[in-house]
Amino acid sequence: MASLTPMMQQYLEIKEQYKDCILFFRLGDFYEMFFSDAEVASRELEITLTGKDCGLEERAPMCGVPFHSADSYIAKLISKGYKVAICEQIEDPALAKGLVKRDVIRIVTPGTVTDSAMLDEKKNNYLMSIYKNKNYYGIACVDLTTGEFLSTHITFGNTFNKLMDEIAKFSPSEIVVNGEFFHDENIKKTLKQRFDVYISGLEDKFFEKEFSIQKVRNYFKDYVIEENAFDLYINASGALLEYLEQTQKVNLSHIQNFNVYRIEEYMILDMATRRNLELTETMREKNRKGSLLWVLDRTMTSMGGRTLRKWIEQPLINLHDIKDRLDAVNEFKERFMIRSEVRELLRAVYDIERLMTKVILGSANCRDLISIKHSIGQVPYIKELLRDLKADLNVLSYNELDTLTDVYEIIDKAIVDDPPVAVKEGGIIKEGFNEEVDRLRSASKDGKKWIAHLESKERERTGIKNLKVGFNKVFGYYIEVTKSYYSQVPDDYIRKQTLANCERYITPELKEIENTVLGAEDRLVELEYQIFVDVRNKVAKEINRLKTTARSLARIDVLCSLAEVADRESYTMPEVTDDDKIEIKDGRHPVVEKIIGQEAFVPNDTYLDMDENQIAIITGPNMAGKSTYMRQVALIVLMAQIGSFVPAKSAKIGIVDRIFTRVGASDDLAAGQSTFMVEMSEVANILGNATSKSLLVLDEIGRGTSTYDGLSIAWAVIEYIGEKIGARTLFATHYHELTELEERIEGIKNYCISVEEKGEDIIFLRKILRGGADNSYGVQVARLAGIPDPVIHRAKEILKKLEDADITRKEKRITRRKQPIEGQIDVFTFNAAQRSYDEVLNELKSLDITTLTPLDAINVLYNLQKKVKG
């Protein structure tokens, strides 16, 4: 260290404190990076890697970016999974004695980004904290850009699966965890691969209960904490607040409301269901287009867009709340003119939530204040329009709409209507607001007039026709003379600079005027900035009123958006009840019909209850529309419970507490699981957590294994749902044998997708009919999919031979009906040898399950199965 230059010593001392960050080290007009940081940044940002003398034998690797365009480079590094520490000069270099003092003023991480250029305006950027205590979890979430703070804990059931569901709900950009969690590489790997999320560790001491209680009390003084309560969310919340303080190093007073929620307060949607129903993004491409959010989002504001996403992610289960929303949507749908005027006013509303965060953090400029002014300027007109509506004014947040006329006037009187971006270059305060500003501005203008007069006078005195007076920040004001007039330069001109085609001079008179002008301008700029900061601070004090109004505007925006969609897409108002019936007339899939057009979509009816129509077994060929139909029913139920109209002629929806889906086949390579293992894990989760109030959507259960294994599993699953759970269920299958269950178990009904045969071809009619299908049409579907003709012909030959070699379908059904299946299916009932049974039983008893890896377990099961089969 002794041989290093003082600046490099300073750099390394600061870097030592932020080892996990790329350090942006301010040097003049650039942020510089050195050593390993420079090598990483030059590669990731595709900028030139150079070197700098640092006092060592070899030059230090170095690269840099201009400070005025640093945001785009920081955004790129954040998107690639890096943290960036911003190290600024914290004293004026002109006044510094020796080395300029520097320090890190902020750490930018994926979960603490506040720059709008790095954010999706209609999506929250959540930072999550997870506290793991044995198999229990505390969770806290914050969106630094809006100040929203949420927390909960998970202390019963399959806690890890519930944790995954909560992470899927919030989709955080970054997760902060305690030591036990951080050092569990398997969990970290699972999180990173499933959610593509950045994991940050924080010392265990910041998760301790006593520390966390004090931290929460410091921020949320009105929240009462019981000292001995087993509230793991307190541990997570305290740690999250500590992490924010460590990274932001500024006042975080915009985080004000401590919202503790119970997972059961809303409809529960697990990770698989969110993915399968494509609520906010498509399953494969992860695109917004093609999701339910894409269909429903006609919001006019960023705040409304984020609120709509939350409604979709967290459907309601309280009947009163659902009806209130539906009534408000209906009111806006019926009152076209009011809706149109409100939406037009909302178009002029900026993102008040995120703008107020910038105000609190001290990063808001004059244009941000003008955006706030324009936004609150719409509120009185919106409030006047809402007064004419009949819907419950509380649902419309009418009483929470504050016209904020005092805040409007604070900004309007002080800040010019079209201010520059920079706040330290003047031109931001209105004329007449401050006498001293007006005086300095006048002095500056008079000085510039004197300079213009001097230029004219000097041209006349010297005879130099193209003489001009110019200015730059290095030399100040100067007189410029081109080469051809050098001989006419007077003796009182003092040369300051020689350029290729001209020379620059000063005179005593010019210097005197310069001192007057620049002195006035410097004082003016400083005074304007002080006034701006004062105005910004006054606005900051009204943050509660502004945030409350922002939430109200967002809610109104969503209600109008849902009404607009209902009107444009011919949706109907559902009748939501507390009973167990789901009755949909001419239901349509909202996304598919949006893509192909309403005229091309074939609507279908649905009827489910807890008596004779509890389980619908749906058969039919691939590509016929079974999956689309089942997803459509689930989406209609979900839409009704967020307060939206639905794509149907009519709909009666008995509230569901959870929607489960097992749709499609996919390997979970991240967890080392096969398609069948993924399927069985999801089915196990459904059977373990579904209630009689749930809606189950199950597609092709058992297809990932052999025919008889798959059929047995599917059969047993249906029995269990019907006899043990009692949930309303849509069950699509290729196992036509399952249609016999209609005669065996009360509450099961068979349905099929209608198909029209034309010669060797088939036409999918997309209509759901009563009864089971008697043909899978596999070869015909293969032809439609583009399988070559020789393969199709050969498939037909093989199919004919297989059908001839087997007993007829009718005989098989008769045989099965003579031998009814009783009770639950036992994996050992097909083995007649008692000796094999004993061997398998003893081997199972001696197994230590806790030491088995997934691969070991599969091998053991394989060997056991061989013994059972003999």
Curated annotation (Swiss-Prot):
Keywords: ATP-binding, DNA damage, DNA repair, DNA-binding, Nucleotide-binding. GO terms for molecular function: ATP binding; ATP-dependent DNA damage sensor activity; damaged DNA binding; mismatched DNA binding. InterPro entries: DNA_mismatch_repair_MutS, DNA_mismatch_repair_MutS-lik_N, DNA_mismatch_repair_MutS/MSH, DNA_mismatch_repair_MutS_C, DNA_mismatch_repair_MutS_clamp, DNA_mismatch_repair_MutS_core, DNA_mismatch_repair_MutS_N, DNA_mismatch_repair_MutS_sf. It comes from the Bacteria. The keyword ATP-binding applies. The keyword DNA-binding applies. GO terms for biological process: mismatch repair. ATP binds at G620, P621, N622, M623, A624, G625, K626, S627. GO terms for cellular component: cytosol. Pfam families: MutS_I, MutS_II, MutS_III, MutS_IV, MutS_V. Belongs to the DNA mismatch repair MutS family. This protein is involved in the repair of mismatches in DNA. It is possible that it carries out the mismatch recognition step. This protein has a weak ATPase activity. PANTHER family: DNA MISMATCH REPAIR PROTEIN MSH1, MITOCHONDRIAL, DNA MISMATCH REPAIR PROTEIN MUTS FAMILY MEMBER. This is DNA mismatch repair protein MutS.
